[in-house]
Amino acid sequence: MTLKNYLFLLVLLLAAGVRAQAPSGNAYPKREFRAAWIQAVNGQFRGIPTEKLKQTLVGQLNSLQGAGINAIIFQVRPEADALYASQHEPWSRFLTGTQGQMPSPMWDPMQFMIEECHKRNMEFHAWINPYRVKTSLKNQLAPTHIYHEHPEWFVTYGDQIYFDPALPESREHICKIVSDIVSRYDVDAIHMDDYFYPYPIKGVDFPDNASFARYGGGFSNKADWRRGNVNILIKKLHETIRGRSGHQAVGEVRNQPVRYLPQSENRSVGQQHKWFAEL
């Protein structure tokens, strides 16, 4: 269950019709991609006893399989944390209720979901949020969180904290996380949500003046420079994944149709057509 022929793909959530009866026989083309997201940030996992949560996930997979879904995009890294046994980041508060607290009894949700998906001939896509660290400043970070070791890598924007996308150290850390995932887990793809700079807050500029002064040589404006920073991360992730696994795909999430790429580039700072052409 790999996507060896694709380096990048646009992942579409099939929001409509997931409860419909799946066509019988070979009604679907062999390579048609029919995916559904299972997210963690809505709180559906938090504090649920392990066996009950496993039963819930199995029930969701059975329903989605019956609806014809053949790929699951499962959120494993919402806030530079982990819904898996990470070697580099703390357990997610969206699993146990407290960041850094191990599940009890110990289990690995990503490994469990990989096994259950593959039993059903479904692809498993590991969904990460690369830059986001805090969705609210009120949230507490675990003592082992990378933020405490390297606060200079991060910026506060509005009520949230992010890796500074301009810093080589930020990119290296994100690539290290992805390398760990693809080398230890049988994932079929890495799926990136919020791969771009944060959506603008009216009247508040993203606080990267110091980074622009340090790394912005050769760019006449921040917009082009920020696009370049995102492009560098995508290229490095591509190289990381191909170097470690040789076959996994990279997906990215859009909230606008592809025909609006030029406009969305100005807003979310991504150049998808460039990635397709060059990587």
State each model region's role:
Residues 70, 77, 120, 142-144, ...:
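Polysaccharide-binding and catalytic clefts of secreted carbohydrate-active enzymes
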Residues 40-44, 78-82, 130-134, 196-198, ...:
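Solvent-exposed loop/turn segments at secondary-structure junctions
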Residues 69-104:
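Aromatic-lined carbohydrate-binding/catalytic grooves of carbohydrate-active enzymes
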Residues 55-82, 184-189:
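Catalytic domains of carbohydrate-active enzymes, especially glycoside hydrolases
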Residues 48-67, 94-120, 173, 228-239:
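Aromatic- and glycine-enriched glycan-recognition loops and surfaces
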Residues 2-9:
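Sec-dependent signal peptide recognition
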Residues 11-20:
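Hydrophobic h-region of N-terminal signal peptides that target proteins for export
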Residues 31-33, 39, 43-55, 115, ...:
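Active-site-adjacent "subsite" loops/lids of carbohydrate-active enzymes
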